[in-house]
Amino acid sequence: MKVVAPMIDDITKHSDTYSRLYCRQRFATSVASPEAELDLASAALWLAAEDCPELDTQVYLGRLESLAERVRVARGNRPGSVAALDALRSVLVEEENFRGNTNSYYDPKNSFLNKVLDRRLGIPISLSIVWIEVGRRAGIPIEGV
């Protein structure tokens, strides 16, 4: 048993290293896409997965899609960008309570998209990713500036 334990530790270390490299490679591939095809949420989730290897990116992409569906329903048949942004704000702010973390701005969890989606708490850049990606999935053209 004394021989097996160090081997398991070694395998675990290598597994963690390979997992991080895989996540970094997926992130690099994501951001190498042309800007029009860039899936900001996927890139942000692969970045988060480097720190959290058990993260299932598809689960969080599905959550963004679910939020987008709710935005589409909230917008209904109302035309125009004001109606679109009102529906987006209604779902993300009023219903889901996404907000800035004013108590602990520098908490690393504010930067990882999975944690922002779990906690509904983030910093301006991570909350912007939520708004942009939910809006995009809901058919609302939003661009960062």
Locate predicted features.
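A structural boundary/capping signal
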Residues: 1-145
